[in-house]
Swiss-Prot record:
Record's subcellular location: Nucleus; Chromosome; Chromosome, Centromere; Cytoplasm, Cytosol
Name listed for the protein in its UniProt record: Histone acetyltransferase KAT7
Compositional bias per record (Low complexity), positions renumbered to this chain: 44-59, 136-147
Family assignment from sequence similarity: Belongs to the MYST (SAS/MOZ) family.
Organism, as annotated: Mus musculus
Active-site residue list: 510
Positions where Phosphothreonine occurs in the chain: 87, 90, 106, 130
Modified residues (Phosphoserine): 12, 52, 55, 59, 66, 104, 113, 126, 160, 164, 166, 180, 508
This protein's domain notes: The C2HC MYST-type zinc finger is required for interaction with MCM2 and ORC1.
Regulation: Histone acetyltransferase activity is inhibited by GMNN in the context of a complex with CDT1, inhibiting histone H4 acetylation and DNA replication licensing.
Compositional bias annotation for Polar residues: 98-107
Cross-referenced InterPro entries: Acyl_CoA_acyltransferase, HAT_MYST-type, MYST_HAT, WH-like_DNA-bd_sf, Zf-MYST, Znf_C2H2C, Znf_C2H2C_sf
Tissues with expression: Widely expressed in adult tissues.
Region (Disordered): 1-175
Length: 613
């Protein structure tokens, strides 16, 4: 592509006129934007006329070589009214028609300024001229003729785009992480090609949570299940719209006919649960485990009812969808500094959340921890050497409760600061809403342990403020994952209310509660209320009396009664219904676990409320 350019003589402007004449045409100070536009139009017209006139006078014309073979040399010239106070002006872009050697025309964009014009240089390699006759001395005076590497690279990219006949405005935008995170990534499951998704809504996946192969499914099966789930959701939404009486308030809490039918249906489905696995099924499951190990999900068929298994599958798909949304938003990054596992005693625990351990420990991915003093270390060798000389066999503080092998220690955050800080960092690995890490001095920690011949092993703990303005009896509560679903969480809750009874106070846990914490507390409140109603023989009952006897906050009592549909409003009064079916169900459960020692005995508590702390 060749461009015709008028040769510039020394001491003249680009249009062949003298510098003084052209600078007079360019003078404009303190004028409005509209005046500036009209003047620019006039200057372009005069320049075109002079260019035509100079062409008629047989001015010499040079042809530049094609952009594809050699890069054209540009020179820039700045003409101002005053040499002492140059005023920079933002360049404006104008489309120009340039003719290729082949005869085709394409639009290119060239920058023009109110005070700048771009010309092609002669064969000489002299520096660009300025009003003072010297090369520019500051970065603000340097234009495209400045020889730097970044500029050369940008010119080369522009030339390649011009050769292809594409517009610079069509250049692809830079992708952000959430738009390009999946490039050069693949699923970590062995043998998986990253196709499909557990939710059935995505074509690819890059994590185990969305891998169909890990969940022993195919991509087509996931799509079929997604369609079935969407259909069920639509039917449920339609039933809610048609149900005008679906209100859960104090005045109307009776379940609707549709809800009762659904409850009966669920009860029938759960009765179809198989009593146990056959010998062939056990062999099949063991073979699957030996073949794939931890790279595949265990086979779950026939372990529970079809309804519960389908409910679990839907929960898995929903969790995978939420994780995919977070990953697309950039909130989940690969290789983030998060501890994946911890070696704690004879257990290896997978962590759930991020904990603010020091950077040199957080980036390891695997942390080694002493189960007695809770000191964290980087390697197995350091842990082995530490255990050889660690003299701790139980938590610090005072042992205030012991029954059998279960003990509870009261640890003051002010006296044992390091231990309590390590305990909080450990708890954050399994709690989402925990914010207390280092400021432990205003808190008391009650640590529950189980003793054997090697020492007192940590089961869980709860903390509470020494002086709580709102009478919170629990600030944070945790049961270690290896002891979950064994009744220890309810024992910790019961022990916190036992301390409130000794203090003669009404207590309540600090909000917000975690998901597992809320489930545990609702179960405990339900059990307390049903036990109280079972032993109550009067005709009139008071929420205040229940609160004083059980140390449970009245707000928690009312919310539990509403959840059990035992609180009604009739003839201007609130009534508490004594539902015998719920009480009988609770009695049957108590009879099954009567031999269990997972209860707190008030006679084993040796403790007096602290004063002046």
């Amino acid at each position: 592509m060749a461009i015709g350019v008028v040769k510039r003589n020394a001491g003249s402007s680009s249009d062949g006129t003298e510098d003084s004449d052209f600078s007079t045409d360019l003078e404009h100070t303190d004028s409005s934007e509209s005046d500036g536009t009209s003047r620019r139009s006039a200057r372009v017209t005069r320049s075109s006329a002079r260019l035509s006139q100079s062409s008629q006078d047989s001015s010499p014309v040079r042809n530049l070589p094609s952009f594809g073979t050699e890069e054209p040399a540009y020179s820039t010239r700045r003409v101002t009214r005053s040499q002492q106070q140059p005023t920079p002006v933002t360049p404006k872009k104008y489309p120009l028609r340039q003719t290729r050697s082949s005869g085709s025309e394409t639009e290119q964009v060239v920058d023009f300024s109110d005070r700048e014009t771009k010309n092609t240089a002669d064969h000489d390699e002299s520096p660009p001229r300025t009003p003072t006759g010297n090369a520019p001395s500051s970065e603000s005076d340097i234009d495209i003729s400045s020889p730097n590497v970044s500029h050369d690279e940008s010119i080369a990219k522009d030339m390649s785009l011009k050769d292809s006949g594409s517009d610079l405005s069509h250049r692809p935008k830079r992708r952000r992480f959430h738009e390009s995170y999946n490039f050069n990534m693949k699923c970590p499951t062995p043998g998986c090609n990253s196709l499909g998704h557990l939710t059935g809504k995505h074509e690819r996946h890059f994590s185990i949570s969305g891998c169909p192969l890990y969940h022993n499914l195919s991509a087509d099966e996931c799509k079929v299940r997604a369609q079935s789930r969407d259909k069920q959701i639509e039917e449920r939404m339609l039933s809610h719209r048609q149900d005008d009486n679906n209100r859960h308030a104090t005045r109307h809490q009776a379940p609707t006919e549709r809800q009762l039918r659904y409850k009966e249906k669920v009860a029938e489905l759960r009765k179809k649960r198989n009593s146990g696995l056959s010998k062939e099924q056990k062999e099949k499951y063991m073979e699957h485990r030996q073949t794939y190990g931890n790279t595949r999900e265990p086979l779950l068929e026939n372990l529970t009812s079809e309804y519960d298994l389908d409910l679990f599958r839907r929960a898995q798909a929903r969790a995978s969808e939420d994780l995919e949304k977070l990953r697309l938003q950039g909130q989940i990054t690969e290789g983030s500094n998060m501890i994946k596992t911890i070696a704690f005693g004879r257990y290896e625990l997978d962590t759930w959340y991020h904990s603010p351990y020091p950077e040199e420990y957080a980036r390891l991915g695997r942390l080694y921890m002493c189960e007695f003093c809770l000191k964290y270390m980087k390697s197995q060798t350091i842990l082995r050497r530490h255990m050889a000389k660690c003299v701790w066999k139980h938590p610090p503080g005072d042992e205030i409760y012991r029954k059998g092998s279960i003990s509870v220690f009261e640890v003051d955050g002010k006296k044992n600061k390091i231990y309590c800080q390590n305990l909080c960092l450990l708890a954050k690995l399994f709690l989402d809403h925990k914010t207390l890490y280092y400021d432990v001095e205003p808190f008391l920690f009650y640590v529950m342990t189980e003793a054997d011949n090697t020492g007192c092993h940590l089961i869980g703990y709860f903390s509470k403020e020494k002086n709580s303005f709102l009478n919170y009896n629990v600030s944070c509560i945790l049961t270690m994952p290896q002891y979950m679903r064994q009744g220890y969480g309810k024992m910790l809750i019961d022990f916190s209310y036992l301390l409130s009874k000794v203090e003669e106070k009404v207590g309540s846990p600090e909000r917000p509660l975690s998901d597992l914490g809320l489930i545990s507390y609702r179960s405990y409140w339900k059990e307390v209320l049903l036990r109280y109603l079972h032993n109550f023989q009067g005709k009139e009952i008071s929420i205040k009396e229940i609160s004083q006897e059980t140390a449970v906050n009245p707000v928690d009592i009312v919310s539990t009664l509403q959840a059990l549909q035992m609180l009604k409003y009739w003839k201007g009064k609130h009534l508490v219904l004594k539902r015998q079916d719920l009480i009988d169900e609770w009695i049957a459960k108590e009879a099954k676990r009567s031999n269990s020692n997972k209860t707190m005995d008030p006679s084993c508590l040796k403790w007096t409320p602290p004063k002046g702390t």
